[in-house]
């Protein structure tokens, strides 16, 4: 498909998944055009439904490589850039927190279900990779234990490994799970987190951040 078609498809995905309100269709389109360095856009007449996120992101990434927007065509750099793409669709942290709190008043289950779905819809939890994991349950005296073999994390390519070794070491964010990761653009030796949202919670008078793991665990 053409670039314009893929932009329309992605924005439609955002609307269908609830990430983007209809009122922000044009705004989101323009955010994507800026990201790709495009100044012109002709909205396709075709209407899209049930958009496959993995497919449209792959095509947009290929376009970014062809245009020179994405300098290296490897999984590390593609992951960094597709996270930047998704950031154009993801609600701001305050909006996510507000929705979570409102749903929590109705039911903690509703709130956590909303947050889990959001983490997948934003591509923070990559559904198409998680499917590769092997999972099974083992009974124990404490209840069933979930065991998994993580096959969803792709292997880094040699160029990315070499670049990571040469990259300047940074103390920011302090770790992979710290609050400072929320919205962080990432670098070759630290994953992008622009599509990540953290829910502040208080436990025994201490402030914590509730978040989902990329591997679907709760942290």
Task: Kindly give the residue locations of the regions a language model identified.
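A short, hydrophobic C-terminal helix/tail in secreted or cell-surface proteins
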Residues: 216-218
């Amino acid at each position: 498909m053409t670039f314009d078609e893929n932009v329309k498809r992605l924005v439609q995905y955002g609307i269908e998944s609830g990430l983007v309100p209809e009122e922000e269709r044009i705004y989101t389109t323009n955010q994507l055009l800026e990201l790709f360095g495009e100044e012109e856009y002709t909205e396709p007449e075709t209407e899209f439904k049930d958009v496959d996120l993995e497919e449209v992101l792959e095509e947009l990434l290929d376009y970014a490589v062809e245009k020179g927007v994405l300098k290296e065509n490897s999984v590390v750099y593609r992951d960094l850039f597709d996270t930047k793409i998704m950031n154009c669709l993801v609600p701001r942290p305050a909006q996510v927190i507000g929705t979570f709190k409102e749903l929590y008043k109705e039911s903690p289950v509703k709130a956590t279900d909303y947050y889990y779905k959001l983490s997948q819809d934003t591509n923070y939890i990559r559904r198409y990779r998680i499917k590769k994991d092997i999972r099974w349950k083992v009974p124990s005296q404490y209840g069933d234990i979930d065991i998994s073999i993580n096959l969803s994390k792709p292997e880094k390519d040699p160029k990315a490994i070499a670049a990571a070794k040469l990259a300047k070491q940074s103390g920011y964010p302090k770790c992979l799970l710290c609050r400072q990761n929320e919205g962080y653009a990432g670098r070759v030796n630290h994953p992008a987190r622009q599509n990540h949202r953290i829910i502040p919670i208080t436990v025994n008078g201490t402030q914590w951040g509730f978040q989902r793991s990329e591997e679907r665990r709760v942290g």
